[in-house]
Amino acid sequence: MSEVLPAPSEFPAPVTSSPDLLVIAGEHSGDEHAAQLVRDLLQQRPELQVACLGGPQLHAAGAQLLYDMTEVSIVGFVEVAKHYGFFRALFERTLDWIERYQPKHICFVDYPGFNLRLAQELKKRALSKKGGGTIGLSYYIGPQIWAWKAKRRFKMAGLLDRLGVIFPFEVDCYQDTALPVEFVGHPFVCADHQLPFRYDPKGAVLLLPGSRVAAVSRIFPVLLEAFRLAKVRQPELKACVLYPSERIRGVLLRILGEFPELQSAVVLKANSSEPQVARAVLMSSGTMSLAVALAGIPGAIVYRLNSLSYWIGRFVVRVKSIGISNLLLKKQLHPEFIQAAAQPKVLAAALLRACDSDAAIAASRGADEIRALLNPGSATRAADWLASEL
């Protein structure tokens, strides 16, 4: 079933005639990372006027919210194509707002399909510095060119003024371009960042089906059936499912209603500032999988796409793993079950293995290895990087 996206209405005028900074972040993870960046930035420079296309966390951090991008999160070639008209309208609204109000600087956060096209059009319209205009363009958390579409780096060098990356190895990926690239630290390993999860051998099983409606609809039934089968073997098991928005909660409730025997064993919780304790996890491959790995929680990664999107992806994606922790360590810290391999019986067995103490020891060692690789540095390193341009 294809979800219906709300038509983008006209964006509000900025608080000031020309804002200092426009931040554009798609998806819940981008909203979270961008919010921390803006929070740190405004602590240094409270006089700055910041507007954003993002989500509730960016708004809470002090940015004027022009449009909630977290409500329109979609992944997959086919899925994006189905909603081309919507994204085209959103793209034009964004361009019109930028052209009318001329923010001094734009910081793109992840979301490359939208953001790089926008940077290209800003250059074409002579609005960005690369096109002879006045608007500076920074990019925080760049596209995963090490995984696919590596040639984008040359296009980026012609569009952007600078790039801040969150993995140390990414700097080398741009060595053959003229783009200034700086490793600004990963937000999950900064000294003042509290991970959303914590390992506890007596905790619940964590089920993380993702933050996109289509992905949750596809993955959550499989996770619930796997949990049900595992619970037959270990009746004491309980599960906790975290959700990022009321929209996703509605999807989860509908699917959970199809498993009446699990009603008393599965709890739905909104994401919060308090860490969720867990003994094991079944999760999608998104940003939260790295947070789980850093918390030392054993488990497995589950990934299912539209069949055509998956078939196309096999020809363009160059990496052997989809979990960032597995990519960083070059080993399967969390076993991956992709597409047809994501069968409930197999996942149930993986979940039961993850509940074993040996799995917890391996997960803890993996967390230490990842933390050492990401080299935390200054907690405000990303904000310092962006502030130098404002």
Model feature map: region roles:
Residues M1-L390:
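Nucleotide-activated sugar donor-binding and catalytic core shared by glycosyltransferases
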